[in-house]
A protein has these predicted regions:
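Acidic catalytic/metal-coordinating carboxylates
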Residues: 36-39, 62-65
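Active-site beta3 strand of CheY-like receiver
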Residues: 47-53
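Receiver (REC) domain active-site loop signature in two-component systems and cognate sites
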Residues: 56-58
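Short amphipathic alpha-helix used as the core "switch/output" element in two-component signaling
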Residues: 64-76
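Short, flexible helix-to-coil linker/hinge segments that flank and couple to helix-turn-helix
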Residues: 89-96, 100-152, 156, 209
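Helix-turn-helix DNA-binding segment
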Residues: 144-179
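Basic, Lys/Arg-enriched C-terminal extension of HTH/homeodomain DNA-binding domains
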Residues: 189-210
Length: 210
């Protein structure tokens, strides 16, 4: 029986692309879709799937927080996280949140199928690029500790601020109020011992988090 896959992504074109790639195999099939975190949680709670492909950048709730909640509902359900963010930026957090694998959306189709095959067997998938990054690591363990102090949402907001997006645009993108984003920003600066966005951006760039 083919591996039954649910694809959670808010972009229809990307979902269709995944369906075509996965449809080229005989042992895997996309049986359902979700366009946001809440829909994903609802479907996982009421239906049985063999594997989930999750975009962590969907509107609304932070994708990694959704992943944690989903694993609480279905602890044994394997999840492949796919994102536009570089592996160095989110992969470790994804694994710690319960993911079985992490790929960027620019990964070739053969690597996607390899990851899905391995994950469907109950194993973890780590790309060669991520493995190299893990070996190199951050040069300063104190900086790693600072990053670990951030929540998933704070980490996401930090990345968006460092990319040059204003608070208003970040609020719209994450479906949050400007006040909430400003509060996250204040928490981030305090936890990282920084005074302004310029220092934050420099920190992110120096540690190759963007």
């Amino acid at each position: 029986m083919p591996t039954r896959i649910l694809v959670a992504d808010d972009h229809a074109i990307f979902r269709e692309g995944l369906k075509q790639v996965i449809g080229s195999t005989v042992d895997m099939t996309v049986v359902d879709e979700a366009i946001n975190g809440q829909e994903l949680l609802n479907k996982v709670q009421t239906n049985d799937y063999d594997l989930v492909i999750l975009d962590i950048s969907m509107p609304g709730r932070n994708g990694l927080d959704v992943l944690v909640e989903m694993k609480n509902i279905r602890p044994k359900l394997p999840v492949l996280v796919m994102s536009m963010h570089p592996e160095e930026q989110y992969a470790l957090r994804a694994y710690k949140s319960g993911a079985s694998g992490y790929l960027t959306k620019g990964s070739p189709s053969n690597e996607l199928l390899e990851a899905l095959q391995k994950i469907s067997l109950g194993k973890k998938y780590v790309s060669s690029a991520l493995a190299e990054s893990l070996v190199n690591g951050l040069s300063d363990t104190s900086q790693q500790d600072l990053l670990h102090s951030l929540s998933n949402r704070e980490y996401q907001v930090m990345s968006l601020i460092a990319s040059g997006k204003p608070v208003g645009k970040i609020a719209t993108e994450l479906t949050l109020s400007v006040k909430t984003v400003s509060t996250y920003r204040a928490h981030i600066l305090r936890k990282l011992n920084m005074k302004n966005n310029a220092e934050l951006t420099r920190f992110v760039i120096e540690n190759k988090l963007l």
